Regions:
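Pyridoxal 5′-phosphate
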Residues: 1-182
Length: 182
C-alpha cells in the first residue's frame, strides 16, 4: 500500500542488496537475447556497482557508467548519448547514500522510454524510502528496491517491486515461494 502497487508485484528479500541483485541479474539473464547493454551511474551504491561489474566481467554484458554533475546528479545528456538498440536496462538510485543528491528519475525515465519503451528502468530507492513519496507506477519505473530498516523496520528485510509485465529470472534456486522468483 505504501508504494501503491499490486501485492503480486512485491517480492520480499533479505534487504536492499538482494533486491538490487535480483533486479539487475534477474533482468539481465531474462532479457539477454534482446540486448547486452546496461546503464547505471558512476556513484551508485556498491550493491549496484559490484553487480554491474559482475555482469560485465562474468556474463559478458557491456555497462555504461554515467558521469554526474557537480551536485552529484546524473547528466541527462550522457544518458541520451548512452542509449542504443542493445540497451535492455537502466538502473539509477533515487537518493545517493553518500552525498545525498536526489536524482532526476522522472526525467530519466522519460528519456529512456521515449527512446525505447521496452528498456527496463530500475531504481534503488533504499535511501529515499520513507522520506520521499515514491510511487513506481506514477514515475514509470519497472523495478524498485527498498529496505525495511529505512522505515524503522528490522535489518534483513527488503522488497523489490517488479511490474507484472517484467520478465525476470531467479537468482536463488530451490524454493518455490514468490512465483519461483525467490
Amino acid at each position: 500500500k505504501l508504494l501503491k502497487v499490486q501485492e503480486k508485484e512485491i517480492y520480499f528479500t533479505s534487504g536492499g542488496t538482494e533486491s538490487d541483485n535480483l533486479a539487475l541479474i534477474g533482468c539481465a539473464r531474462a532479457n539477454h537475447r534482446a540486448g547486452k547493454h546496461l546503464i547505471t551511474s558512476s556513484i551508485e551504491h556498491p550493491a549496484i556497482l559490484n553487480t554491474m561489474h559482475y555482469l560485465e566481467e562474468e556474463e559478458g554484458f557491456r555497462v555504461t557508467f554515467l558521469p554526474v554533475d557537480k551536485d552529484g546528479r546524473i547528466r541527462l545528456d550522457a544518458l541520451k548519448e548512452a542509449l542504443c538498440e542493445d540497451t535492455i536496462l537502466v538502473s539509477v538510485m533515487y537518493v545517493n547514500n553518500e552525498v545525498g543528491s536526489v536524482q532526476p528519475i522522472e526525467e530519466a525515465v522519460q528519456i529512456v522510454k521515449n527512446y525505447n519503451k521496452n528498456i527496463l528502468f530500475h531504481v534503488d530507492a533504499v535511501q529515499g524510502f520513507g522520506k520521499y513519496r515514491i510511487f513506481p507506477k506514477r514515475i514509470g519505473v519497472d523495478m524498485m528496491s527498498v529496505s525495511g530498516h529505512k522505515i524503522h523496520g528490522p535489518k534483513g528485510i527488503g522488497a523489490l517491486y517488479i511490474n507484472e509485465k517484467v520478465k525476470i529470472k531467479p537468482i536463488v534456486f530451490g524454493g518455490e515461494q514468490q512465483k519461483n522468483v525467490r
